[in-house]
Amino acid sequence: MISAIVQAREDSSRLPNKVLKKIINKENSISLIIKRLNKSKYIKKIIIAVPHESKKFDYLKKKFKNIELFKGKKHNVLDRYYSAASFFNVTTVVRITSDCPLIDFRLLDKMIKNFKKLKVNYYSNCITRTFPDGYDIEIFDLKK
């Protein structure tokens, strides 16, 4: 199953709660990302991975019926991704960060299609910068 995992947190040293601040049409970054990911043909599940301590993201389960909220280790983002993927039996992870509200679902679908066609384990547009910052997408298979 192809799932998007969006890592989010409240504490940012430069701009606390930045992903929860209203930016476009009274929407915050995380809501915009969810709406854009919902347009993908390939994403079967959207998982928001937040630290255990986070309470400010709980409203998302009421606002969006098709998302899952996973709470994991605050200071180990990699473990949070892995634990969320394992918990929900994800086979292919689409890694998105919550401070990229302009993510393009058409680009995402094209990348997922290429990932499947090429049969690679990892596919990204941010190792060699091919798109502007904010369009970062990483796709990888989770082998157990």
Regions found by a protein language model. Name each.
Residues 7, 96-97, 125-126:
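Short beta-strand segments
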Residues 43, 90, 117-121:
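Short, high-confidence coil segments that cap the C-terminus of an alpha-helix
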Residues 1-16:
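N-terminal nucleotide-binding beta1-loop-alpha1 segment
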